[in-house]
């Protein structure tokens, strides 16, 4: 008994246990733990407030209420310790035992434990092979169950209704068979669980053998699955040594009374824990049942009482899981034992994972513009309170006081000595500042406190970005690290000066913003005709002197001699160069410094000069920036919003164009969808043009002054318009916002996300009219509503990510992986979105990288690719690089240093023990929240680019076609007839410069081998609809196109013209199609294949030709409208990221080809079309290896007869299904796809995240394997196992000469992956607590406490960073200063003698 409680006491040595096991408690075990039986439902006597004997608070069972004092008062004080009072039976001991002693209730009848009964799948039901419904009938006394059929025809476990049971008794006699109802019956069945025939053995192991045998014989898949499910439960019992009958409770433990307290309120009432009510209910019903049984009451009454007891115990363990929720007097559901653990307010998340911290305070923050980067201003009153113990200690040490009490008085009086001592205590003692919400690790940083008057904490302005803090009333919390170790960690790891780079992307996060940027930008700008323009100076010092004397203006253009060269620059830039480290060249700042340039400057300084210089530079830049922003005296006036003169003309032109399109629509040339899209494009275009005009007018001005010859002259120069300056420098605002102030607001979106086609032509300076204002409110309101919802969503995403990745820790130096991934530049639509250099920076090379021309080794295998190496690789023209990656790391637990590469926040290789999983989760989750909050800043102005409908090349060169098949029209234009064709532009040497995919139906404007200039149009197509094009000339013949059945003639209300569109038909065999016939009426064949020229029409296609029309090759016969574009917002973004990480199957996912091959169409079946893909082997088609795919009729198939497809290519329109990609293309391809998809969402928002973070999460999602063939291993078919467990088991079997199991990789979503982790503590504190614990208890799981979360919950140091096991056993040798001094003296003496 004592042992179990040592577990709850604070372990003296944190290593007192290394693993934790959970299993079922047997009735004997419960009695062994217990200190006595609770027999009465009474709690305490309301008059004396003493606990009632044998009641729920009984002192005899649970211990004394007051320390060392028995209940009746006979024994008091320490001297009687350990005595048991003979009068009241209470042991004289500390009262805290009331927190740890258990009692028990012996039940009059066994009851089922609701977790094992109702938690799906029902464990008791599974084991007995009875459905849950039947089981409940038995337990809640509604039916009898046969326990032992003996000689009768009944089956064991068969249900009998009351009538049937009575009949059977009459028929067979009383002793012919045994049947029962209620808990006893089920207990009997559980005790007798075993195989049907004796050949397999006895009991549970026998049952397992029998099921195994059945599984081998089972033919149908469903049956196999069912047996496997049951076998899993049975195996768990075999392995864990739990007995099935322990799932029924005969004894219930009663938790210690101080954990379910009863507190007297004033007014004679009591506040009580709900558990007491639940226990009272159980005891009452139990006692009543005992009494009824002693009285031999009628069966029906006893049965009812048993049912009620079962219900009471159910409510105690998990209220509301079955039947009505039991409520207290105030109609509130009572909190049961399960509810104590579950959810955000449960034990796990409220008290174990998040605790309140002593030695902490919070206050409003204000800016501290003169602090150094490593400092924060701490209010004196606050510091006095936080550092009290230290002050008391120092006061005693210095002899000001002798006792703690007098020290306390002295501090309360705030005597002058106290302040001096406070200064001393605080020196070199860092404090932690935290701003909620803490979204990434930079939300808590350490600073050295500086004492200040006032009550607000002062925060350094440069760390605001990391905290996402502003000074509009934000509050921050202060925490004091107490122990020397904690202070060390705060100083070395968490000091703000050690966190210059962001862990998410490795660029500086301590970056000047707002006013500072404004000031530096202002001082590095050049102004025409400024005082002292054109002067020549011999040194920067002279410039400074001239500026101080007022001889030259800050923005005057001057010549200065720098490092022996004459440089053209401005006064401001020379002054700026004064504060920059000397290792940086003057070129690096001799330009207009905006926010981007400043970030680059900080980055460069960090790389070249190291951390210390960077910190000094940051502080100097801050001071200089604030100073110059003040001197600049920038303000905003109405006249600064310049409305472009051309605006009126542009609007008139747009209105005319819109009218034209309306006319075309009225004549029936275009569809309603095309009209809408075109109108929206016109307005989007005009808004852009107005904005450009406005930026042109705001951004430049004419300066007038006297030239060298004294004549008046004019010069154009970038404007000094304050609004323009703010946006251009990156200090505040964006072109997007200025456009709304002075251009036109443009298109707005409805709440549904569609764009309203009438734009707001006014801007805020002109003011909006009522209608425009009303349209605006849509967007603004949606923005606010979104924000509220998204913040919660994003927080939840982060929580799931952290949970899945919490045990990804760097555990070893090199795992010896021979495999890696290949990275190149990220290209989209012919544009390089992310150059290769950025993607490979800080990674480790897999193989030697050779220069393609000279053959020299540029980077050795397993060497880190740093900035210098990236330059080498780029200059050598290498475009694909093999690097090591987290995805291919072979470390058994965790990840190795080499596969991870650079620690982005430190700029060097990662340390062993770094919790890279959590960092990855935070890096992905943090911008999620930021983005969600960022929706409404533009006020819902619809930003959407005109659809791309052309291809232009960027470089001059030669045209090459790759896999492009064309149809030539009569007029000689070429129309592209297949999907995955590409146009390649090569240079003279034939090296590929750019590559563009061409859309089906595009018109080619160039020929193979043609020379093209830069920016020439190569191809164009209709962006609003996808055409269906005929490849042969002939006459159109409709097939299955029946009006009102498969097509509908829609008469457009506005134009009065009819249009034919294909609709979904009720007839499953109808196949709407268009065939092309020749003169004789035979269907024509397609060129170079023997397939017929028949075109199936998907739902929604608009017919362009009529029955009997003559068509030419390359003509459009039908159009598929593309969806009207919605605005892209992270709204699409956050759910998209979540669905990618959850690995959800998209609703209408595309069918993809599993092999390379040639497309043909087979016979249609059941309203589905059959696509057959035949592989080529040695350039011969092999129909025997062909794969067939059925695609629903309404879907648009994007391949055509004779197309060559690659494995993994989509055969129809639709979203890709990650599980298919994994199955067909393998893990690496899937990982690449996931990384690209996630990155795309963030890139749209301009958020940078390093690929390796996403890879880390994907690695955690791919940890498992599904067993396909068990071989001779212990696994079950279809079981999911960890990859490494799978490999180990296979090695073991192969060594023994058996057959290894076969598995296929499995992609789990992050929630599933978190719940299937090895650690049950971690999984249960994440979600579905009861389910996880139920499963763990049955299989007697052992948690080896390897992850971070389990250790936090158990109250131990986390096994990462400084908490790594390796650091716990270090021997530290301390050299005493005395020895050192003596040694030094000796050395000096010897030196003197010599």
From Swiss-Prot:
SMART domains in the record: RPOLA_N (SM00663)
Details of cofactor binding: Binds 1 Mg(2+) ion per subunit. Binds 2 Zn(2+) ions per subunit.
Reactions that this protein is recorded to catalyse: RNA(n) + a ribonucleoside 5'-triphosphate = RNA(n+1) + diphosphate
Pfam families cross-referenced by the UniProt entry: RNA_pol_Rpb1_1, RNA_pol_Rpb1_2, RNA_pol_Rpb1_3, RNA_pol_Rpb1_4, RNA_pol_Rpb1_5
Residues noted as binding Mg(2+) in the record, renumbered to the chain: 470, 472, 474
Keyword set includes Nucleotidyltransferase: yes
GO cellular component: DNA-directed RNA polymerase complex
Keywords, comma-separated and alphabetical: DNA-directed RNA polymerase, Magnesium, Metal-binding, Nucleotidyltransferase, Transcription, Transferase, Zinc
Cofactor(s) needed: Mg(2+); Zn(2+)
SUPFAM superfamilies associated with the record: beta and beta-prime subunits of DNA dependent RNA-polymerase
Gene Ontology molecular function: DNA binding; DNA-directed RNA polymerase activity; magnesium ion binding; zinc ion binding
Keyword tRNA-binding tagged: no
GO biological-process terms attached to the record: DNA-templated transcription
Binding site for Zn(2+) 1: 70, 72, 85, 88
HAMAP family in the cross-refs: RNApol_bact_RpoC
Subunit structure as annotated in this protein's UniProt entry: The RNAP catalytic core consists of 2 alpha, 1 beta, 1 beta' and 1 omega subunit. When a sigma factor is associated with the core the holoenzyme is formed, which can initiate transcription.
Its job: DNA-dependent RNA polymerase catalyzes the transcription of DNA into RNA using the four ribonucleoside triphosphates as substrates.
Official protein name in the record: DNA-directed RNA polymerase subunit beta'
């Amino acid at each position: 008994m004592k042992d179990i409680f040592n577990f709850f006491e604070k372990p003296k040595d944190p290593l007192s246990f290394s693993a934790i096991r959970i299993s079922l408690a047997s009735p004997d075990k419960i009695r062994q733990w217990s200190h006595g039986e609770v027999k009465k439902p009474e709690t305490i006597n309301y008059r004396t407030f003493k606990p009632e004997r044998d009641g729920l608070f009984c002192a005899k069972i649970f211990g004394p209420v007051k320390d060392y004092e028995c209940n009746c008062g006979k024994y008091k004080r320490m001297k009687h310790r350990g005595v048991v009072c003979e009068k009241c039976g209470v042991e004289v001991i500390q009262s805290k035992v009331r927190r740890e002693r258990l009692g028990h209730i012996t039940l009059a009848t066994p009851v089922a434990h609701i977790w094992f009964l109702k938690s799906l799948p029902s464990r008791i039901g599974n084991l007995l092979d009875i459905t849950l419904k039947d089981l409940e009938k038995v337990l809640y006394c509604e039916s009898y169950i046969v326990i032992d059929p003996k000689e009768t025809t009944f089956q064991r476990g068969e249900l009998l209704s009351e009538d049937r049971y009575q009949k059977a008794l009459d028929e067979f006699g009383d002793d012919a068979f045994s049947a029962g109802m209620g808990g006893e019956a089920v207990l009997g069945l559980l005790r007798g669980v075993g195989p049907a025939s004796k050949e397999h053995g006895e009991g549970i192991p026998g049952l397992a053998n029998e099921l195994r045998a059945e599984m081998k014989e089972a033919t149908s898949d469903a049956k196999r699955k069912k047996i496997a499910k049951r076998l899993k439960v049975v195996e768990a019992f075999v392995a864990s040594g739990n007995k099935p009958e322990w799932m029924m409770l005969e004894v219930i433990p009663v938790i210690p009374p101080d954990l379910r307290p009863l507190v007297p309120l004033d007014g004679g009432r009591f506040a009580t824990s709900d558990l007491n009510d639940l226990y009272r209910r159980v005891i009452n019903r139990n006692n009543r049942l005992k009494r009824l049984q002693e009285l031999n009451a009628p069966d029906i009454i006893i049965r009812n009482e048993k049912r009620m007891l079962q219900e009471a115990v159910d409510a105690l363990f998990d209220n509301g899981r079955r039947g009505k929720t039991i409520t207290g007097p105030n109609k509130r559901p009572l909190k049961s034992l399960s509810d104590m653990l579950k959810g955000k307010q449960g034990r796990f998340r409220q008290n174990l994972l998040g605790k309140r911290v002593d030695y902490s305070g919070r206050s409003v923050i204000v800016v501290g513009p003169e602090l150094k980067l490593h400092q924060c201003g701490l209010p004196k009153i606050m510091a006095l309170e936080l550092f009290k113990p230290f002050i008391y200690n120092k006061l005693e040490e210095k002899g000001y006081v002798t006792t703690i009490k007098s020290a306390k008085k002295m501090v309360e009086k705030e005597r002058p000595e106290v302040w001096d001592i406070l200064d001393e205590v605080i020196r070199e003692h860092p404090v932690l500042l935290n701003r909620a919400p803490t979204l990434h690790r930079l939300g808590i940083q350490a600073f050295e406190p500086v004492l200040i008057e006032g009550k607000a904490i002062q925060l350094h302005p440069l760390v605001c970005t990391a905290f996402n803090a502003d000074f509009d009333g934000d509050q921050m919390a202060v925490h004091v690290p107490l122990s020397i170790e904690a202070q060390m960690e705060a100083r070395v790891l968490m000091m703000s000066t050690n966190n210059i780079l962001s862990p998410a992307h490795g660029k500086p996060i301590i970056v000047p913003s707002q006013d500072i940027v404004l000031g530096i930008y202002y001082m590095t700008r050049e102004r025409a005709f400024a005082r002292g323009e054109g002067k020549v100076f011999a040194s920067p010092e002279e410039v400074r002197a001239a500026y101080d004397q007022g001889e030259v203006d800050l923005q005057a253009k001057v010549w200065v001699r720098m490092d022996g060269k004459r440089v053209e620059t401005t006064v401001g830039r020379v002054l700026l160069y004064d504060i920059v480290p000397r290792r940086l060249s003057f070129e690096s700042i001799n330009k207009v410094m905006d926010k981007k340039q400043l970030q680059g400057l900080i980055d460069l300084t960090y790389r070249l000069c190291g951390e210390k210089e960077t910190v000094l530079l940051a502080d100097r830049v801050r001071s200089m920036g604030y100073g110059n922003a003040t001197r600049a005296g920038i303000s905003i006036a109405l006249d600064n919003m310049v409305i472009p003169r051309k605006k009126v003309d542009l609007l008139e032109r747009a209105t005319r164009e819109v009218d034209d399109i309306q006319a075309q629509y009225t004549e029936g040339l275009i569809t309603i969808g095309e009209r809408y899209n075109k109108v929206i494009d016109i307005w989007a275009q005009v808004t852009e043009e107005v904005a450009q005009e406005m930026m042109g007018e705001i951004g430049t001005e004419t300066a007038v002054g006297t030239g060298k010859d004294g004549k008046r002259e004019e010069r154009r120069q970038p404007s000094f318009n304050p609004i323009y300056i703010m946006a251009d420098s990156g200090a505040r605002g964006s072109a997007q916002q200025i456009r709304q102030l002075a251009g036109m607001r443009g298109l707005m979106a409805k709440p549904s996300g569609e764009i309203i086609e009438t734009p707001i032509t006014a801007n805020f300076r002109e003011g909006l009219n009522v209608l425009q204002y009303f349209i605006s409110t849509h967007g603004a309101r949606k923005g606010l509503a979104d924000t509220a919802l998204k913040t919660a969503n994003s927080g939840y995403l982060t929580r799931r990510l952290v949970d899945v990745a919490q045990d990804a820790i760097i555990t070893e130096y090199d795992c010896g992986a021979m495999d890696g991934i290949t990275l190149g530049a990220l290209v989209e639509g012919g544009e390089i979105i992310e150059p290769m250099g950025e993607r490979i920076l800080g990674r480790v090379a897999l193989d030697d990288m050779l220069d393609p021309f000279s053959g020299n080794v540029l980077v050795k295998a397993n060497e880190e690719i740093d900035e210098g190496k990236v330059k080498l690789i780029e200059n050598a023209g290498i475009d694909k690089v093999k690097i090591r990656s987290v995805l291919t790391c072979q470390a058994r637990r965790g990840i190795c240093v080499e596969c991870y590469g650079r620690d982005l926040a430190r700029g060097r290789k990662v340390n062993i023990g770094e919790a890279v999983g959590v960092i990855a989760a935070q890096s992905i989750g943090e911008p999620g929240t930021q983005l969600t909050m960022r929706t409404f800043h533009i006020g819902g102005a619809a930003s959407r680019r005109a659809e791309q409908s052309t291809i232009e090349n960027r470089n001059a060169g030669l045209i090459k076609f790759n896999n492009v098949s064309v149809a030539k029209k009569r007029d000689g234009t070429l129309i592209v007839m297949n999907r995955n064709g590409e146009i390649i532009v090569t240079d003279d040497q034939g090296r590929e410069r750019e590559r563009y995919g061409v859309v089906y139906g595009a018109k080619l404007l160039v020929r193979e081998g043609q020379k093209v200039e830069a920016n020439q149009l190569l191809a164009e197509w209709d962006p609003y609809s996808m055409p269906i094009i005929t490849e042969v000339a002939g006459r159109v013949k409709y097939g299955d196109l029946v009006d009102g059945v498969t097509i509908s003639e829609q008469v457009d209300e506005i134009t009065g013209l009819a249009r034919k569109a294909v609709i979904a038909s009720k007839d499953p065999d109808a196949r709407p199609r268009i065939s092309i016939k020749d003169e004789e009426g035979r269907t024509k064949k397609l060129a170079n294949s023997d397939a017929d020229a028949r075109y199936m029409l998907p739902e929604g296609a608009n017919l362009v030709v009529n029955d009997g029309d003559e068509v030419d090759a390359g003509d459009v016969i039908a159009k598929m409208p593309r969806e009207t574009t919605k605005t892209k917002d992270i709204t699409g973004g956050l759910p998209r990221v979540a669905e990618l990480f959850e690995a959800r199957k998209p609703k209408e996912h595309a069918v993809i080809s599993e092999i390379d091959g040639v497309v043909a169409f087979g016979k249609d079946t059941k309203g589905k079309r059959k696509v057959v893909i035949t592989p080529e082997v040695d350039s011969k088609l092999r129909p025997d290896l062909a794969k067939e795919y059925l695609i629903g009729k309404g879907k648009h198939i994007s391949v055509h007869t004779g197309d060559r497809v690659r494995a993994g290519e989509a055969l129809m329109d639709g979203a890709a299904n990650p599980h298919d990609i994994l199955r067909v293309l393998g893990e690496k391809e899937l990982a690449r796809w996931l990384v690209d998809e996630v990155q795309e969402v963030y890139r749209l928002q301009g958020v940078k995240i390093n690929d390796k973070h996403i890879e880390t999460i994907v690695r955690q999602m791919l940890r498992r394997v599904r067993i396909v063939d068990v071989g001779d291993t212990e696994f079950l078919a279809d079981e999911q196992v960890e990859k490494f467990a799978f490999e180990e088991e296979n090695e073991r079997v192969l060594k023994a000469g058996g057959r290894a199991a076969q598995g296929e990789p499995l992609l789990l979503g992050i929630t599933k992956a978190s719940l299937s982790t090895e650690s049950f503590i971690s999984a249960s504190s994440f979600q579905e607590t009861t389910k996880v614990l139920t499963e763990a208890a049955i299989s007697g799981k052992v948690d080896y406490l390897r992850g971070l979360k389990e250790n936090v919950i158990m109250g131990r140091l986390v096994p990462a960073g400084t908490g790594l096991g390796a650091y716990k056993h270090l021997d530290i040798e301390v050299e005493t200063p005395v020895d050192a001094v003596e040694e030094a003296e000796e050395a000096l003496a010897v030196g003197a003698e010599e």
